[in-house]
Amino acid sequence: MSKYFKYISEKGITNLANYHYSGVDNSFCGNKFLKHWWNYCVNFTPLWLAPNIITLVGLLCNIGMYLIMYVHCPTLTEEAPRWCYFAVAFLIFAYQTLDNVDGKQARKTKSSSPLGELFDHVCDALSVAMFAIVMSATLRIGPYWTFFSFIVGMWPFYLAHWEEYHAGILVMGEFNGPTEAQVLFMIIEIITGIFGSDIWTYGTSTTVGKIATVFVSIGAVVTCLQNFTNTYKLENRMTFGKCLLQLTPICLFTALIVIWASVSNLITEQPHLFIMTLGILFGYIQSRYITQRVCHDDCSLFYPIFVPIIIVVLNSILASSDVHLVSETVALWILFSIACAQFLLFSYFTTQQLCDHLKIKVFTIPYPSNSGIGPSQEYENSLLSQMEEGSSSIGNSTDDINPSEIEEI
């Protein structure tokens, strides 16, 4: 059956021989403070523990924080019990810890691989919608602002990997990277736990929570502009027009969901189901692009998953004109089911392809021998540099990066 579900081309499989993953984390919070905590934690991880298990537990933390808000904030406007906000803050802290320890564990056990990178980023992509819902529920800004927050979250994520596809390196900003966002979210949750969520509802139509969302959005826009600028300045790349063409899937997806949210009441009637359906769809689209980047494969401009999305959007457009073909709620559930099935198929068969080719397993790794030679040592040799953890003084532009300062994240 696997021959019918091959998400990586033969060209992509062949290109894995040239794989290396390098990145620069300029995070102020990470380099100045949290780095020491991450290094401390990795001292306690046993050598038999696969990095992907750490990554999976981090995803479970995000699912846990989402379920808390799902139960207590069904319309994204309710006030949850104070303990919920402290619990969410703890789970975010646990997630950011695990999200950084998994890479260190991979280096520690000499088990770095393309599968590990893909697994890590796919879990992060799935978490975008959950973070949007959780933070919006905390700020009590309602479904439409939650939808806006989701779009604000997915674009910087997609563009970061778009830039990496062409630059060959993932660069995270000093004050506008994921670590700073997670720290900000933790602070918001702790403040809400202490003072209650009513502090975010001050104001009439423009509340404190909405103002906070706008400020976060400005940071996201700045990050996106940096991605465009850095990619435009790159030398030895394809023409910038062809680079922009690779954004077709995310542009089409954004246009479709904006139209859908504009013509349908589903976003207010089923806010959690609506946003999570979009989140799983984005996770799939983003994961396909990450796979193509990791394998240096050709980028697809259209995926079959867009067909059911277009059909459901057209169904809602007709319903807004009193032409009812299928109940919008039923159509939403069908799309949710299709999205889950497609994502699971992609995850299973892509993992199988990589494991078969690399001769590795997803959740187990060979115990390293005394010589330190592991089964994935060939990938370690392909890294640009292995340096001791230290503060980074690298700028946000890829032009400023010194190869000796590159490390695997």
UniProtKB/Swiss-Prot annotation:
Gene Ontology biological process terms in this record: phospholipid biosynthetic process
Transmembrane segments: 53-73, 83-103, 115-135, 141-161, 183-203, 205-225, 243-263, 265-285, 299-319, 329-349
Membrane topology: Multi-pass membrane protein
Family the entry assigns: Belongs to the CDP-alcohol phosphatidyltransferase class-I family.
Molecular-function annotations in GO: phosphotransferase activity, for other substituted phosphate groups
GO cellular component, one term: membrane
Keyword Membrane in record: yes
Protein name: Uncharacterized CDP-alcohol phosphatidyltransferase class-I family protein 2
Biased composition (Polar residues): 388-401
Cross-referenced PROSITE patterns: CDP_ALCOHOL_P_TRANSF
Chain intervals for the UniProt region annotation (Disordered): 388-409
The keyword Transferase appears for this protein: yes
Keywords: Membrane, Transferase, Transmembrane, Transmembrane helix
Subcellular location: Membrane
